[in-house]
Amino acid sequence: MGIRELNLTKEQHEWLNGWLELWGAWVYSGRLEKRMSSVIAKFMESVEPGRVMTRPMCNDDDGMLISQVVDSVMYIDKKAFGILLSYYAHGSSKRAIASYYHETAKPRKMCGRGGEGWRKPSLATCRNEIDDILKASLFVLYQPMQNAFKMRKRVEKVKHVAVKSLDMQLSI
């Protein structure tokens, strides 16, 4: 199966893309390093009005969960991880990422009209590769993200039942 065949359905893509956009804004805000409570964040926004985020972002719990999933899956490919961060956290366009990728690309063995040889990839090739890498990254991330969100909901339900049970035992 080729990389171009790894596609999500429209609904899957919209679900994952929505969460990754919220996560990207959360990472960009710096909350990954200093896990702020929402009270502190609101206070900081009132003190520093220029630092107000205009992008919607997820809460700290969702951000940490998504970061754990992304880190666990994307550690395999540092380049794909960098492209994912550039696109979702920094808000870079695919064209801008491809342009940087093109500028820093080293010559590699490629087939072309002149035959096989060592060439620097064209900007169009870089754009296609960035598209393919992002699509493959989303495909690889989808199922672990689904599992993480489902497991978290189950854990919350179990915690609620366990706390209730513990309260009943302590009251006896």
Regions flagged by a language model, labelled:
Residues 87-91:
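Short helix-to-turn junction characteristic of helix-turn-helix DNA-binding domains
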Residues 1-75, 102-118, 122, 132-172:
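N-terminal interaction/assembly modules
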Residues 125:
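Residues in the helix-turn-helix
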Residues 83-84:
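A short pre-motif secondary-structure segment
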